[in-house]
Regions:
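Glycine/Thr-rich phosphate-binding loops that ligate phosphate moieties of nucleotide
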Residues: 12-19, 25, 29, 33, ...
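A residue-level structural signature of the nucleotidyltransferase/glycosyltransferase Rossmann-like core
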Residues: 1, 26-28, 128
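Enzymes and membrane/adaptor proteins characterized by extended Gly/Ser/Thr/Asp/Glu-rich
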Residues: 41-51
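Single conserved hydrophobic/aromatic residue that forms the stacking wall/gate
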Residues: 1-5, 9
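ATP-dependent carbohydrate kinase catalytic cores
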Residues: 50-161
């Protein structure tokens, strides 16, 4: 969680990074952004709403990068990946020429969010519990964001079929 700290550390400690950011020559993103960037040979700089919601820079109500937060942390919006719903087409890959015909990259979700969809929690009130390296409880709260009860936070559950599904998570 929280891409901001890593980005600030890079800009402050890597020689030339701050200038590259100011010039529009430095990009940032989440793990899906990097994977898609590599798979598309640098053609696509994108992320989905669920991964973006983990950056501390994404507004879950507008589905956009939060300009106030970007300004607060002095992050140029040009560094940020394009935002897409989970069921969008994110690009194409031949996996470095391994395949003759391109394979479409269609569908991206963050891990807990993917588990919510994978457990078919498509209706309000359905949830999942995941235990692994970390643990996560996530419950679909429907298409309207709500203030989470104490100890939980409101997040994007997933975005598909033109709809945004919110979730409580803890």
């Amino acid at each position: 969680y929280g891409l901001v700290g890593s980005e600030m550390c890079i800009r402050d400690s890597v020689e030339g990074a701050r200038q590259a950011a100011d010039n529009g020559d430095l990009l940032m993103g989440t793990i899906d952004t990097w994977l898609i960037w590599k798979l598309t040979d640098g053609k696509r700089h994108v992320t989905d709403y669920t991964n973006a919601s983990r950056t501390l820079l994404f507004n879950i109500h507008t589905m956009q990068w939060d300009s106030d937060l970007l300004e607060l942390f002095t992050i140029p919006e040009t560094m940020m990946p394009e935002l897409l719903p989970c069921d969008a087409v994110f690009g194409e890959t031949t996996v470095g020429g391994l395949f003759k015909n391109p394979i479409v990259i269609a569908g991206v979700l963050g891990d807990s969010h993917g588990a919510l969809a994978g457990q078919m929690c498509f209706e309000e009130g359905l949830g999942k519990v995941t235990y692994g390296t970390g643990s996560s409880v996530m419950v679909n709260i429907g298409e309207k964001a709500a203030v989470a009860p104490r100890g939980l936070f409101t997040s994007i559950g997933f975005a598909a079929l033109g709809k945004i599904f919110y979730a409580f998570e803890g």
